[in-house]
Design a protein with these regions (language model features):
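Conserved cytochrome P450 K-helix E-x-x-R motif and the immediately C-terminal K′/meander segment
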Residues: 55-76, 243, 247, 326, ...
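C-terminal helix/juxtamembrane-tail motif
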Residues: 2-5, 479-508
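N-terminal membrane-proximal hinge/A-helix region immediately C-terminal to the signal-anchor transmembrane segment
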Residues: 2-123, 127, 131-136, 151, ...
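Short, small-residue alpha-helix embedded
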Residues: 296-309, 452
Length: 508
């Protein structure tokens, strides 16, 4: 027995010693690497702030855009801002944004930072459900936004827009912001719900959607149920819209008559386990689609008018009008999906508006695991697990290293051969997000705005009466502040109009 023990010890001890040496060497190497990296992979610098409340006093005094701009100018492309009980690390620019947009949901999550939307969209959808269910619901929307469906929606949009503007006289003055809020609600509801609800939806839905947007304020991100007037109006509006949409869903199911619109697509959708969508889910999905689409298109449509009709941008307005003359000369009064795809100048005009006036102030994520980012200057920062991270679109899309003269409205920057957004690399243009969570409604939004402005440019001479609008920074999805008054005079862009060179393109 003693001999066996000695033999066992003689066999095991060398292995144990060798293993210990190897593990010690590996740990020492890891410590050396960590020590070598520690001077670079340090925590992001923190913006100056008051005790306990952080940057809140500066936020109230300067507004969110200026606070973020100041911190970016002082601290660079990676910095942290303290706001009450929360620390937010901002990642500015394509060099440090890859993980934000491409990271796995297990590493970079939307859930923890987006639950403030639940009072707006309601139960059973979006961030009230688990990731697997939300992915399937996004798939339902994606199926409803495929090119074949967009071709159908284009015809519906054109008819609604043409009918709406018959209400305008030969000349007059209107609040463009209010007009487009109503029109976009009408157009979106036609594509979403069908013709039978069109008149019922118009003014009441537009009012309630405005109350929903007004109820999604900056304070909502931190305190979504704070008993303030804006939240009370939001809750009442959500309840009323829920009633309207529930009636629509019930009526459609009872009719049993298939209709070619988004509601029918969502009713016909099935989860992977074969389950159909419930009425509660349908109401929430319809509301979220209408809310997002109505705000993005009406706000962007208004900004498009404000930019194109500004005196400094007369050249871009002329280019957009000339393009409509070419299209009319080629196709007459026909406007459909294919014709809209040829409106490249108008598309660039809208894209540039979205660069300067994105639908959201910033995008948020929650870091479930720590990660390291490297700036274009070569500095490394480690973002810790548990941190809220933000991509500030208002700064991100105006970087001088990506866009030449970034504060200037210049649609030509997106022309072929110039393509500043492409030259800047991935995630240089993020008006509709990007990566794993790019907006599925981007093509729908562009098409809707193009239909509206194609009609306006063809049929009206326009002049902006109001000063260039300020931005309403009080809400999460900022838009033009106040009235945007426009004077118009009807004109006829005849298909027989003489075009000097029908193949002339906007000079980039």
């Amino acid at each position: 027995m003693e001999l066996a023990t000695v033999n066992w010890v003689a066999y095991v001890v060398p292995i144990a010693v060798t293993t210990t040496i190897i593990i010690s060497a590996m740990m020492a190497r890891r410590r050396r690497r960590r020590a070598e990296r520690s001077p670079c992979a340090r925590p992001p610098p923190v913006a100056a702030g008051a005790p306990l409340v952080g940057v809140l006093p500066w936020l109230l005094a300067k507004g969110p855009l200026q606070v973020i701009r100041d911190a970016h100018a002082e601290l660079g492309s990676v910095f942290t801002v303290r706001l009450l009980h929360r620390e937010v690390t901002f990642l500015v620019g394509p060099d440090v944004s890859s993980h934000f947009y491409q990271g796995l949901d297990s590493e970079v999550s939307q859930d923890e930072v987006s639950r403030f939307t639940i009072p707006t969209f309601g139960p059973g959808v979006a961030f009230d459900v688990d990731l697997a269910t939300r992915r399937e619901q996004i798939r339902f929307f994606g199926d409803a936004m495929k090119p074949a469906k967009l071709r159908t929606y284009a015809g519906l949009m054109v008819r609604e827009v043409e009918e709406y503007f018959t209400r305008w006289g030969e000349s007059g003055m209107v609040d463009l912001k209010q007009e487009l809020e109503l029109l976009v609600t009408l157009v979106a509801s036609r594509c979403l719900f069908g013709e039978e609800v069109r008149s019922k939806m118009l003014r009441e839905a537009a009012t309630h959607l405005r109350e929903l947007n007004d109820g999604m304020r900056l304070v909502t991100i931190l305190f979504p149920h704070l008993p303030i007037p804006a939240h009370r109006r939001r809750d009442r509006a959500r309840a009323r819209l829920g009633e309207i949409f529930s009636d629509m869903v019930r009526s459609r199911r009872e009719a049993g008559r298939p209709v070619d619109d988004m509601l029918q697509c969502l009713i016909d959708s099935r989860y992977k386990d074969g389950r159909a969508t419930t009425d509660t889910e349908l109401v929430g999905m319809l509301l979220s689609a209408l809310f997002a689409g109505q705000h993005t298109s009406s706000s962007t449509g208004t900004w498009t008018g404000a930019r194109l009709l500004a005196r400094a941008n007369a050249e871009h307005l002329r280019a957009a009008v000339r393009e409509q003359e070419r299209v009319v000369g080629r196709y007459g009064d026909r406007v459909d999906y294919e014709v809209l795809q040829e409106m490249e100048t108008l598309h660039r005009c809208i894209k540039e508006v979205l660069r300067l006036h994105p639908p959201a102030m910033m995008l948020l994520r929650h870091a479930r695991r720590s990660f390291t980012v490297r700036t274009r200057e070569g500095d490394e920062y480690e973002v810790p697990a548990g941190r809220t991270i933000a991509s500030p679109l208002l700064i991100h899309n105006r970087l001088p290293q990506v866009y030449r003269d970034p504060e200037r409205y210049e649609p030509g920057r997106f022309c072929p051969g110039r393509g500043e957004d492409g030259a800047g690399g991935a995630f240089s243009y993020t008006a509709f997000g990007g990566g794993r969570h790019a907006c599925v409604g981007e093509a729908f939004a562009y098409m809707q705005i193009k239909v509206i402005w194609s009609h306006l440019l063809r049929n009206f001479e326009m002049e902006m009466v109001s000063p260039f609008p300020e931005t309403d920074w009080n809400v999460v999805m900022p838009g033009p502040k106040g009235k945007v008054m426009l004077r118009y005079k009807r004109r006829n862009m005849s298909p027989t109009v003489k075009i000097t060179n029908p193949h002339t393109r906007y000079v980039c």
